[in-house]
Amino acid sequence: MAENKKDPISTAGAAMRKAAGTGLFKNIENLYAERVRQLFKKNDDIRDRGLTPPDDVVRETDISYGTDPAQALDIYYPAGASGPLPAIISVHGGGFVYGDKERYQFYCMSLAQRGFAVVNYSYRLAPEHRFPAQLQDTNMVMRMIGGLSMIDMNNLFMVGDSAGAHLACQYCAALTNPGYARTLGIETPPVTIRACAFNCGLYMFDPKKDRMMARCYLDGPLSDYSDKTDLFGNITEDFPPAFIMTSTGDFLQARAEPFAALLTRIGVENELHVYGDEENRPGHVFHCNIRDPLGARCNDDECRFFMRHTV
């Protein structure tokens, strides 16, 4: 998802309400999803225009991890690497309705240039596939990456942005809280995430601001899923060390500090980083723009955080 200083979810919601009022659209959720996809694609096309894969990164692409066409992943690693590498699993954002590995390939290859094997995967999208499809896909990826020769299974890291941060956080909570995994209905593999990074994250759903997003994502009212979507109530002291990133132009900036405060309160190592200032206000998920010097600095900071937690 491209950098955005305005809230594209609200923009899509306004367009949705206007169009729905004409009576031309009976399925308001599909209308919302299509509008979000149009807005995000336009911005991503601008961000990535002219980019080509770097020569110093090896790409193994379109590896199936399931039977649905969307269930595919790429793995990237530095050219010349001869053995298993610390690995980053990237969980893309997009409001649960948009995004795939192609949209995140240049960002993920830039992480590989920093000395990691990087797993860049697509997952099934809402509203065509409701929760917990996205979480199930993440679990399937984690189950199959042990068979990839370039991945050091003793040094796994996870990064997610926006809605992908919600999924990454939820999955890390399930890995470290067996009761929560049972509530979610997933059986996690015996893996350890050494550290994680959450970028411009959506951690908890706001019943008002996120109403339409939740309606697309969940197969029922948000209140019916409170036990499953309550990340704050299911994170334990065993949660991985976390790098929490936001920016002065991020429309989700207000969500970061309460999350960091929660982790601190329960004894989980964490760092909260706010990039930019009042004059330079980088937008939502600015770090995905590999041409942005501040985005590069953020990604450097996160990779250093990961390397400090290798074993």
Residue ranges of model-derived segments:
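Alpha/beta-hydrolase superfamily serine-hydrolase fold, recognizing
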Residues: 2-311
